[in-house]
Amino acid sequence: MESISNQGLTLLLGGARSGKSSLAVDIASRTQREVVFIATAQALDADMQERIARHQRERPKWLTFEEPFDITSAIKKAPSSACIIIDCLTLWVSNLMMRETSEQEISSACTKSLSAISQRNGKTIVISNEVGLGVVPETALGREYREILGRVNQQWARAARQSLFLVAGKAFPLHDPKEILQ
């Protein structure tokens, strides 16, 4: 598997309500650059519609691309010097799986997105959930999702300059196991 390194890429991992999105917003706000928000959520119910509307009200000056499937095209639309937040890989992988996209195609889409990010000058902050810490999912689809998302997270972490794991609003740096074994 091809490894793309990007010095401007930060990956934020954690569970639900762990502080990932808040930290991403804080990091982006401190860059003093234009911020582009790439949202992968789909407004399929009233709760998600309200959540999306609230996020848009909270960040009216940010350029938002709602892109549940092709994040590479959204990355390429963003100004090169802008700070991008991609929120989140968790829903993106789910969206692709619901379209019956194979794991190989998902991995290829990750590679294309990472390549697009490596062409940019601005910082990119990517959010994803770590879903492998809980109980084993009851359904085959749930287990397949957990496995694919875990491998997707690893692919993005390998490319990132910095990966952080968030728990209860606290961030822990993640280290490459190869560094530990040296």
What are these regions (language model features)?
Residues 24, 55, 85, 129, ...:
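Residue-level signal for inorganic ion chemistry
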Residues 1-4:
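Pre-Walker A adenine-sensing motif
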Residues 6, 10-78:
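Conserved P-loop
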Residues 62-108:
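Helix-adjacent hinge/juxtasegments
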Residues 10-13, 38, 90, 110, ...:
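Flexible, compositionally biased loop and terminal segments
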Residues 35, 84, 162-165:
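Short, well-ordered beta-strand core segments
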Residues 11, 85, 125-127:
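Structural motif
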